[in-house]
């Protein structure tokens, strides 16, 4: 199978849709056929929509790197609510949009041609990120309310990583991970109200992702978001949760051991 056939089978490209009233006018107006009569291909609108989200995630990563470098050497802490909220939104766009691309593309492909399908796809992504934003705010308010002494923040950060690994062994994590994999693809036709359907799909998927990655996200909040190295490490773990093969119990224990080792390393390096 050639590359073009593989892309066409995946729905990423398709034959250019002809326009006009007669065959000669269509070929002249759109250039859809060469002298041999072979039809040209175009990138499908759902693929362009997914590409736009991927570019947005890349821009968010660039901004995350810039923020981390501009706060180099900052001590672990949450900072003001405004600064935390801004940094958290950017980080969620960088980390979570790529893992949601399969669902975004599937929704766009199924809804293409219906009224306001582009708006509905944007609503899905916005709902997904809004759930993560609310989770981040909840972590912020809970952690700022706890009387954590500054002298033991490095110990708290190490414990957070160890507890994130322990959370990976819980039934809640396992059930959420299975649900997350199930909701990554749509099943059946979309309802008539496309925008409302996008909100429901985005909210359900986000809630399953929160249950799947809550331990790592709490650790990220506690460790502080100014450390680019920890952001990349935890982002890789989350991407593996969502897009990798379903882990066995042995792999779950291995993940716990890795996170415990990272917690010890963080405590020693702090």
Model-derived features with residue positions:
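Juxtamembrane transmembrane-helix termini in multi-pass membrane transport proteins
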Residues: 3, 37-39, 84-127
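Histidine-/acidic- and/or cysteine-rich, low-complexity loops and terminal segments associated
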Residues: 3-13, 22-90, 115, 148-152, ...
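Lipid-exposed faces of alpha-helical membrane segments in multi-pass integral membrane proteins
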Residues: 51-59, 82, 86, 90, ...
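A small-residue-rich subset of transmembrane alpha-helices
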Residues: 56, 116-144, 213-248, 256-260
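Transmembrane helix boundary and interhelical junction motifs in multipass membrane proteins
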Residues: 96-104, 210-216, 228-229
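Transmembrane alpha-helix/helix-exit interface in multi-pass inner-membrane proteins
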Residues: 133-183
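Alpha-helical transmembrane segments of helical membrane proteins, especially in multi-pass transport
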Residues: 169-175, 194-225
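Final/C-terminal transmembrane alpha-helix of multipass membrane proteins
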Residues: 253-270
């Amino acid at each position: 199978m050639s590359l073009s056939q593989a892309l066409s089978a995946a729905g990423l490209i398709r034959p250019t849709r002809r326009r006009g009233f007669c065959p000669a006018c269509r070929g002249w107006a759109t250039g859809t056929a060469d002298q041999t009569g072979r039809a040209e291909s175009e990138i499908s609108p759902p693929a362009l929509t997914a590409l736009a989200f991927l570019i947005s995630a890349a821009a968010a990563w660039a901004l995350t790197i810039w923020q981390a470098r501009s706060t180099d050497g900052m001590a672990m802490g949450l900072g003001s609510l405004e600064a935390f909220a801004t940094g958290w939104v950017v980080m969620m766009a960088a980390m979570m949009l790529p893992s949601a691309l399969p669902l975004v593309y599937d929704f766009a492909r199924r809804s293409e041609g219906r009224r306001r399908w582009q708006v509905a796809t944007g609503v899905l992504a916005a709902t997904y990120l809004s759930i993560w934003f609310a989770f981040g705010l909840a972590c912020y308010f809970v952690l700022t309310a706890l009387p954590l002494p500054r002298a033991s923040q490095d110990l708290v950060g190490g414990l957070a990583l160890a507890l994130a690994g322990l959370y990976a062994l819980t039934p809640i994590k396992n059930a959420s991970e299975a649900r997350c994999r199930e909701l990554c693809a749509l099943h059946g036709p979309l309802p008539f109200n496309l925008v409302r359907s996008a909100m429901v799909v985005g909210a359900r998927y986000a809630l399953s992702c929160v249950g799947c990655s809550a331990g790592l996200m709490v650790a990220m909040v506690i460790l502080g978001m100014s450390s680019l190295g920890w952001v990349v490490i935890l982002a890789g773990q989350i991407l593996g949760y969502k897009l990798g093969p379903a882990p066995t119990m042995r792999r779950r224990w291995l993940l716990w051991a890795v996170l415990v080792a990272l917690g010890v390393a963080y405590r020693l390096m702090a």
